[in-house]
Amino acid sequence: MTCRTRFAPSPTGYLHIGGARTALYCWLEARHRGGEFVLRIEDTDRERSTQGAIDAILEAMEWLGLDYDEGPIYQTDRVARYLEVAEQLVADGKAYYAYETREELDAMREAAMAKQEKPRYNGAARELGLPRKDDPNRVIRFKNPLQGTVVFDDLIKGRIEIANSELDDMVIFRPDGFPTYNFAVVVDDWDMGITEVIRGDDHINNTPRQINLYEGIGAPVPKFGHMPMILDEQGAKLSKRTGAADVMQYKDAGYLPDALLSYLARLGWSHGDQELFSRQELIELFDVKDCNSKASRLDMAKLGWVNQHFLKTEDVAAIVPHLVYQLQKLGLDVAAGPAPEDVVIALRERVQTLKEMAEKAVVWYQPLTEYDEAAVAKHFKAGAEVALGKARELLAALPEWTAEAVGVALHDTAAALEMGMGKVAQPLRVAITGTQVSPDISHTVYLAGRDQALKRIDVAITKVATA
């Protein structure tokens, strides 16, 4: 049987980090087993579902590179199918119409609580065989088995058993003509041939009800794997402030999608002591049965370390589009400066995020207007104009402007003046960047471009002369 998994977000907000991990695990399980991954949008909550949230989810999935074989499939396009299955259950004696008012339902729950019983529907209409009629309170309820136990072997948590006496006859079709969540997902999983349901353990209480529904409609019951939640660094539930952010905020913060996926994979799954995984390694090694049954803690410092590794090792061409995004976010004209590939090569060893890389690269994409006073005082002393002037002379004469050629010219400058390289590099670094901290001097000068480099050296020579 072909493995088929699904990621089924409700479009009531952005895709947060926990949802991204769920999507990743579903995607990896399907890819590892040579199966198929389905994206389903569970949008039957018409009051809370928005097109903006749908767009945000699709954008995040695309950025993460989690491609799907089918979808997006929208539940709101399938309401007629849900009604067809619900009415068949009624015809088969497995479900029934009920018409209690809100006040009557509240009275049932209050009576149960007065007896110190679990508040729930008491099955008043279960055996009445009421016909369908126009009524603002009309619902369809599923006849949950009265005896027995629901037993399933969770792929992550192990065997779980729930007595049917703990469950009531749940509503499967609401008065507004829409299915309930538990019913719609079961019909969807049946129609879409889903074989494995991987989701957060906040859904675990739904599983016994859903298993009874699968069996009630004659559908095969998929395997279930419920992942524990992700906690913040203090062990508390994640909040927006502590990391439960929109996935696209991680993009804005300068994380590479492959780095985020590698980190998320380890938040609940492991393969020995290995900490870093390429996308292909994850596909080859992932098995949902290896997931941890205990909650994981988000560690932003660890994520930074992982991202730094990917910046150092990933193909330059793969990093460039993400750097361009960061440069444009800063309002920079990418065409007005060095090739982004060259910026990646120069800075990839010196930063943790692409945002930091872009901020350090600003000096090469716009005019230099500010100088660090301490750097000027230290390196624009009398005599510095000699090194600057000789460097300008040799740089201007270069037949070809490359980082290597620039490096040779600067070493020739030091040799011609019989001084250490630092005496040439530091004044030149301040001249080009306005600070005394930058990548190696050959890349620093090269990235400015010949015309800008010569102009900035001229300004620096004037500053030294007038100091």
From Swiss-Prot:
EC number: 6.1.1.17
Cystines in this chain: none
Name of the top EC class for this enzyme: ligase
Short motif ('KMSKS' region): ranges: 237-241
Main location: cytoplasm
UniProt keyword annotations, A-Z: Aminoacyl-tRNA synthetase, ATP-binding, Cytoplasm, Ligase, Nucleotide-binding, Protein biosynthesis
Pfam families to which the protein is assigned, alphabetical: Anticodon_2, tRNA-synt_1c
Catalytic activity: tRNA(Glu) + L-glutamate + ATP = L-glutamyl-tRNA(Glu) + AMP + diphosphate
Record-listed ATP binding positions: K240
One GO MF term: zinc ion binding
Coiled coil residues, start to end: none
UniProt family annotation: Belongs to the class-I aminoacyl-tRNA synthetase family. Glutamate--tRNA ligase type 1 subfamily.
Functional summary from the UniProt entry: Catalyzes the attachment of glutamate to tRNA(Glu) in a two-step reaction: glutamate is first activated by ATP to form Glu-AMP and then transferred to the acceptor end of tRNA(Glu).
Protein name, as recorded: Glutamate--tRNA ligase
Species lineage: Bacteria, Pseudomonadati, Pseudomonadota, Gammaproteobacteria, Lysobacterales
Gene: gltX
